[in-house]
Amino acid sequence: MVKTVMPHPVGGQPVAISRKIRWGVLGVAGIAVKKVIPAMQKGARSEIVAIASRELAKARQAAAQLNIPNAYGSYEKLLADPAVDAIYNPLPNHLHVPWSIKAARAGKHVLCEKPIALSVEQTAELIETRNATRVKIGEAFMVRTHPQWLRARDIVMGGGVGELKAVTSTFSYFNRDPNNIRNIVAVGGGAIMDIGCYPITMSRFLFGREPSRVIGFIERDPDMGTDRLTSALLDFAPGHATFTCSTQMVPFQTMQILGTKGRLEIEVPYNIPPDRPSCLFLDDGSELAGRSAEVEECIEMDQYTIQGDEFSRAIQEDGEVPVPLEDALRNMAVIEALFRSAGTGRWEQPQAYAADSGS
C-alpha cells in the first residue's frame, strides 16, 4: 500500500507577503549555480537580485545564465548594495565565518552553507555577531525543512516505531581530486565536515536531544591528509546513532530508524530528488526482507526552494530560522568530539560553549 503525504506545514500560518526577500549570493560555487539559485528563484518568498565573484567576468556569466539583474566583481560591493536584504554564503568552508560576519555587520541576514564554521569557537563568534547586529543567521541544512524529514520525525515522536533505539546511516561519494576543496584539509575538507555532518544533525533531530558521548574511527588519505573514511557511534542514552561517511567510496546514502516496535527507512535521506516523490518505508517487522513495509510518498518538492522560503519567512515574520546558530554550535561540538576521539581512541564528550544559551 502506498500513501501520499502532502507537504508538512513547516512554518506558521500563511500571511500576506508584501514583497519577496531580496537575496545576494557570494561566489559562483557549483552548488549555488546548479542547485540553490534555480531552486530559490522558484520560491514564493525569495528572489535572487545579485551575485558576486572575485572575477567580474564569472559573476556576469552566472548572472546572465540565471537571469540575475546585478553582478559584482567583489563580495564587498555586493554587501554594500542596499537592495540586498539577505546573503546566501556557499563559499569554501574556511570562508564561511569571515564573510558571514562581514555580511551581518553590513546589515544583511545570512544563510550560510554547512558546516557553518570550522570549530565551536568560530560558531560562538558568529553567535556573538548575530546578537550584536540583530540580523538572522542560520546554517543551510536543507534537509531539515523537507516534508519527508518532518514526517519522519512526526512518526518517531508519535511512537510509530515504539521507543527509538537506533539510527544508522551511510553517506559516501568518490572524489580523489587533490585540487577539489573537499580534499584540502586547510579549507575544512574531509568526509566529516562535508557529509558526516548530515547524519549527525539528523540523528540529533530525530532523538530530540544531544549525545552524551561519542567515539569515532578515522582513516586518512596518506597524501591529502583528509579523513576519507569515518565511522562513528553517538550515545543518546537510551539509544544510539551510528554512521559511516566517506569521500572515497561508491556513491551511496541510506538512513534506517529502529525502535522497539518498528523500523522506518528513508529512501533518499540527503540528496532528496526534486522531480519525483520521495519515499518512507514503515515496517512492523512481521515479515522479513521488508515485505511488511507500508510506503508513504512525499510529493515532489525541491528542498532548496523550501529552505530559501522558510529562511525568508523567518525574516518577514521575525521568527526563528530553520537551523539556528545554537543548533549549529551543538552539531560542531559533536564533530570536534569525534576528531578528538579518533586521536585518543576513547569516548569523548561534546563540549558545550558558553555562548550556547541552550546548553
Positions of the model-derived regions?
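C-terminal helix-rich "cap/oligomerization" subdomain common to oxidoreductases
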Residues: M1-K20, A86-Y88, R313-S359
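Beta-loop-alpha module in the N-terminal Rossmann-like domain of NAD(P)-dependent dehydrogenases
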Residues: L66-E128
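N-terminal Rossmann-like dinucleotide-binding module
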Residues: V2-L66
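Short active-site oxyanion
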Residues: S46-A50, D85-I87, G189-G190
